[in-house]
Amino acid sequence: MKTKMSFGEALEVLKQGMQVYRSGWNGKNMFLFLKSSDALASDFGFGFGEYINEPVFGNIIFIKTADNKIHAWVPSQTDVLAEDWDIVS
């Protein structure tokens, strides 16, 4: 598999269900993963049309941090322009 990807290439890898990270990140064991809207709705017990005003979920990219927490992730300009993205093996 190709390593040292651009952010655009890393996004495509996320869409395929794999996890990615930047070799330039300081924290150990940090990586991104994509959770689909269908999976999120199912996790929260929605998506079946059972409730009035049932929320609609969108796809979300999450980060697993060095201190073992999961957060929604928003890229910095540095992340977007980086060419050091890699696939978690």
UniProtKB/Swiss-Prot annotation:
Pfam families: Tad2-like
InterPro entries noted in UniProt: Tad2-like_dom
Keywords from the named record: Metal-binding
Binding annotation for 3'cADPR: 25-26, 73, 79
Positions of Mg(2+) binding: 42
GO MF terms held by the record: metal ion binding
Disulfide-bond pairs as recorded: none
Domain of life: Viruses
The protein's role, per its UniProt record: Counteracts the host Thoeris antiviral defense system. Probably acts by binding and sequestering cyclic ADP-D-ribose signal molecules produced upon viral infection (3'cADPR or 2'cADPR); sequestration prevents the signal from activating the ThsA of the Thoeris antiviral defense system.
Quaternary data: Homotetramer.
Protein name: Thoeris anti-defense 2
Organism name: Bacillus phage SP01 (Bacteriophage SP01)
Record gene name: tad2
